[in-house]
Amino acid sequence: MAFSGPEMSDYENVVALNKAWLDLLQRESRLSSGLTGLPDGLRLRLTNLSKQQIGRLAATPLLLFSFREGDDRYWTQVLAGGPERDLFMTSAADDVDTLIAASLGFIWQLARRNPYALRLICGASVYWTERIAEQTFFQLLDAFRSTGDTPSARFVLQRDLWRKLLSSGVSREGVSRNAAQVSALQSVLTDPPDNRAENWSLAARVVSAPQFSVAEEKQPGNR
């Protein structure tokens, strides 16, 4: 049985959201708590990327940040509900709020449209995907906003992977970047955050997804 993988437009949205998150990491202290767990050196590297490096790293074909998709206990509490607030009575959203709304909107519609693709893009469990799909978008957004939390870096406990992403993953050499990005994708597929024995690894092997590649950047002169 073949599963429908992410469409090219899904990958384009992933790249755009990754870029927005990486851009904000360079200047928004609100997101710094999401780097907890990374060594100081990696946090310093991640928050001091050049524009070119951000563009290269953002091309990783999965969300580099997480809403704790594998933490069922956390999301059970988040979705348990409380008094509903009027989303339109709050002050103007800042850039971090905009990132949260855009990211959750993308995740929510994908959970309803193609949950298998969501497994590839953010390692979401079946349980989490089903719970998210049951909500309206505004219910989901309001529930997460009520926690006061912000997205966190994915793979915070996989320090070697982040070292690879922040070295080879931002390299000018397309082959090196591609290898680092594939390593990240493999990690999402083989190391689910809650270590459940689900059938997602089988789905990943037979999924039909657009092919992507990383082209070599043109080098100025002989440098």
Give residue spans per PLM region:
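Structure-specific DNA junction-binding interface
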Residues: M1-A80, R205, S213-V214, P220
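Extended, low-complexity, amphipathic alpha-helical coiled-coil/linker regions that act as scaffolds
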Residues: G5-A16, L38-D40, A124, W128-G169, ...
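Amphipathic alpha-helical packing elements
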Residues: S32-T36, R43-L46, V96, I100-F144, ...
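Long, compositionally biased
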Residues: T60-G82, S146-T190
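Membrane-interacting alpha-helical segments
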Residues: E84-A102, P151-W162
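Short, functional C-terminal segments
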Residues: L165-R223
